[in-house]
Structures are given as C-alpha cells and as structure tokens.
Swiss-Prot record:
Gene that encodes it: hslU
SMART domains hit by this protein: AAA, ClpB_D2-small
InterPro entries: AAA+_ATPase, ATP-dep_Clp_protease_ClpX, ATPase_AAA_core, Clp_ATPase_C, HslU, P-loop_NTPase
Stated family: Belongs to the ClpX chaperone family. HslU subfamily.
Name this protein carries in UniProt: ATP-dependent protease ATPase subunit HslU
Residues the entry annotates as binding ATP: 18, 60-65, 258, 323, 395
Species the sequence originates in: Syntrophotalea carbinolica (strain DSM 2380 / NBRC 103641 / GraBd1)
PANTHER family registered for this protein in UniProt: ATP-DEPENDENT CLP PROTEASE ATP-BINDING SUBUNIT CLPX-LIKE, MITOCHONDRIAL-RELATED, ATP-DEPENDENT PROTEASE ATPASE SUBUNIT HSLU
GO biological process: protein unfolding; proteolysis involved in protein catabolic process
Stated role: ATPase subunit of a proteasome-like degradation complex; this subunit has chaperone activity. The binding of ATP and its subsequent hydrolysis by HslU are essential for unfolding of protein substrates subsequently hydrolyzed by HslV. HslU recognizes the N-terminal part of its protein substrates and unfolds these before they are guided to HslV for hydrolysis.
Amino acid sequence: MTNFTPREIVSELDRYIIGQKQAKRAVAVALRNRWRRQQVADELRDEIAPKNIIMIGPTGVGKTEIARRLARLAQAPFIKVEASKFTEVGYVGRDVESMVRDLLDLAIIMIREEEARKVRVKAEDLAEERLLDLLLPGAQSRDPDLSGEEAGEGGTRDKLRKLLRKGALDERKVELEVQAAQMPMMEVFTPQGTEEMGINFKEMFGNLFPKKTKRRQIKVSEAREILIEQEAERLVDMEKVNTLARERVEQSGIIFIDEIDKIAGQNGRQGPDVSREGVQRDILPIVEGSTVSTKYGPVKTDHILFVAAGAFHVAKPSDLIPELQGRFPIRVELTSLGEEEFFRILTEPKNALIRQYEALMETEGIRLHFTEEAIREIARIATQVNSQTENIGARRLHTIMEKLLEELSFEAPEHREQSVEIDVDYVRKQLSDIARDEDLSRYIL
C-alpha cells in the first residue's frame, strides 16, 4: 500500500489532470486513510470503515482519468467497472458480485508477480543449471574451444557457465520442452450462471487432462527466460499467494464504479428500465459489507473502498435509492472545462495532446512546432463547438486535433525531414468549416 501524503498524491495527479482540485483532494485523503487505517491498533482497525466517494460531473472533465491515475498510485488491487454492464439477479448479464471476483483475480496476478520477484535470483540459478544440462551433452564434440586441458565434465561445465554468463552462447540453439498451444474450450456453461458458486467449468475440465507439451529448438537467450519462468512458478507457493491476495483485497482493495447514473431510476419509471433499481439493491450489500464466495475462498467487502462516478445529465444523485446514497458520504462535483483549461490540457500535462502529436509526426521525420497563439485558437474553437453542440469536455480536443492535422498526417510519408510550424493562420484555415458552420453535427463524436 502506498504511503504518499495527500499533497504528494495531488501533486502526482496534477501531472496528468488539469483542474478538479476538489476531486483530487477527496481521492488523495481517501487513499491516505487506507494507509492510516493500517497503522491503527488491531482492535480499532476493524471498526474504521472506508468513506466511499461519488464523483459528479459532465463527460470529459477527468472522472475516469482520476481513477486511472489513482490505480497506478495506489499499489493496491484496483478495478474499474461500469454499472451499466450489471443486471439484477435473474436477468441476463453479469451479476454484481463478479466485480469482487475480478478484483481478486487481479490481486492474485499482482501477488504472484511480487512473490516471483522475491525468488528471481534462486530461479535464475536453477534455470542456469538446467540450461547447462541442455548444453552439455555433446558440447565437447561440437565446440573445439571446450576440449583440451579441461576435458573433465566439471571443468567443461565451469567453462560453459562462464561463456553462458558472458552471453557468448546466446545464439546457440537448444532443444526445450515447452507447453503447446491448445484450442480454447467451447463454453457449454456461461460463467454468469456458475460464478456465484465459485465454479469455473473451463478450469475444472481443463485440469482433467494433462497439458500437452512439445519439444522446440530455441535460442539460449529465449530458453533462459522460459526456464526462469518455469522455476519461479515451481518456487512460488500458490496457497500463500491466494491467502495474501484475499487479505489484500479485503484490507486495501479499491473498486471504481463508472456510469453509476445509468442505473439511477427516474420517479419510479416502469418498462425496460425496471431492473435498474434491482441492480442498485444488488450493489448495496457489497458496498455495505458482505461476504462474496469465490473459487479461492470467501472475500469480505467491509473495508473495500468504492469510488463511483457519473455524468448525471438526465438522472440526479437523489434518484439513487436512499440506502445507496448513504453509502457514498463524500460527494465531489467536477466542474466543466473552459478555454483556459483546454489550453492548459494541450500544453501542461506530462502526456499533453500536443506532445503526443509531435511524437507521432516525429516518427515520419516531421518536426511539428505549435505557436502559443495557435494552441489558444484550438482551445477557443473547442470551447465554441462544445457550447454550440453537446458538451463532451476535453474529448472534443481529440476531434479538433485530428481535423487540424488530417492533411498533414495523410501526406507525411512523402514529406520527410521537414519542420512544420502550426500558427494561428494554419489553425483557422484548417478549422474554418468548424468555426463557421452553425450545424456542427458532422464533427460531433
């Protein structure tokens, strides 16, 4: 679990996301509280429940991006799900408990990689010995350098080890037994009907038959990596991995539920949306704290942090059932983005859009340079299009940039090794249709 301070978390988010200070502070405090809870005495730790967050704001203002960056910072099991993918129990679709199972699957991969790193040195030593066993038979007859004064097997093995460590044998080929690619099993049973029982039929039937292997001639450099992986797999205790993964999910897991407004009912509407409230009622016990059965054992959700987000264009947060509203005590409103924010988005972040397009064109030998006036004009046109049509926030910049560089991107391979300056006149010329046309529907994503 990360021990970044709230200020450090906000500072890290600032490198990628412009504005939305309130939302950044809320998730930073929530993440820090996860670490604080781990430092509390055992008898009180179980009593401290996470304060779930709901982020409210129009599309394209940074809700999902905050979640993505939070996942990388958290160093904890983190999964993003869309509420609209789930259906009430009894309907066709995924049941809500699958989000916890998916989180556990992710945690197992995370812990397994951590444990594999711990045994990497031992795995490398064992892999080296196996590689020497593969190289040694007939080595003297094939390589005159290995004969002579060190004709004994021990001497040959040591000499071979030195050559192997130097990389002198990397291009030599050895015969190695590797797992053969198998045809995927046909799904007779859909996972939706069986996952709540913790049964994976594909895995169950797959384990009934031995895995097929085949012998392949591969380079020593490639064989070394395969053998290290095989040895690490043998050294890692999967029982321990499963136990640690369950514990980490229970104590520091984070679930980000996007599009939560899509399951909000509107004044008791009936018809095709009748199952929306059912999905909310199914999500409720998981957010409140319950035990979910998985194939690795039961997982308690009492201390999993839930972060929900929605645009709430049509529905309102108050349209969610009261019990679910009460489980998200921290509400954060994200503000719409204007011209100044668009200018900053284009220039300030580490992965700024302008830098991305410059890097793409650089691969064709074309060096792009945007003047400040040109970037401000792009921001102004994006704001204008958003105000006259659907406001899709920062995503509008992708549309504008693609239109702006469409001609240049098409002709780039024929005009290598050039420097191109994008000035305000070029922007106005390329985007004149958008700036002039009142009916902008053909430019809407």
